[in-house]
């Protein structure tokens, strides 16, 4: 049984449809990234899964129960964790006090010292929340989400405000949680975060899912053309090259192919045979950001690569 199952989900506010015919599943132990621009329907969808908002149509199961069913909502909320973009935490409590209080709301919480260690606030455990930096407060937010030892964790922009080191630490924490069986639903605008963490991705735009798959396959990434670029060697002409050239501007050769290994083999073999240097050789693939922007902004136009 999947941790989350959504079938033909719909939500309307009067004449406005916030979510339209959305379907997906999240397998236990996976990290599932739900992406989309502001206003696409992400927050509404997540709040329905959490049981904080009613749906207009469709079927939803979270940890095997209907989150809209009042009789199971208390049970569900003791088995899920939620990390919002902004949390209101008592500024005059210490980190340890806040976590200890919240741990008391759950039947089988994770030990508070373990949580403090996981979120990297051991040196700040007895400091008041108001003295924490923005990044440290964000770590505390994550701690509050995991102190209940949840089976399912909802993370909304978990690394916003963190420096690069803090982001990597948070990623490591998420990986550790999933290795222990925790399922994670992630919303983020950082595509590198998606590629680092997610097993599956779905992109919402204008209330509908416009694409779903793995980070490496969504939008045809795994079958798209690769662009190979290098400077034409001194003494060589385009006609000397063993492959078809798509463009040549100011000495920069550009070749597009779906068979990059064969082409690179031919190209490097030719260069070695003639003692040429392939200066500036680069292989440019379609990025997840390229695909995301195409799906959410200019889906009627050909996908353009961000790399130059």
Regions found by a protein language model. Give the residues of each.
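ABC transporter nucleotide-binding domain
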Residues: 170-258
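ABC transporter nucleotide-binding domains
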Residues: 2-6, 11-205, 211
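Short, charged/small-residue-rich alpha-helical element at the C-terminal edge
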Residues: 224-298, 308
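ABC-family P-loop ATPase nucleotide-binding domain
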Residues: 1-10, 298-308
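A generic structural signal for secondary-structure junctions
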Residues: 63, 81, 103, 107, ...
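An acidic, carboxylate-rich microenvironment
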Residues: 57, 72-75, 97, 217, ...
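Short secondary-structure transition/capping segments
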Residues: 30, 42-43, 57, 234-237, ...
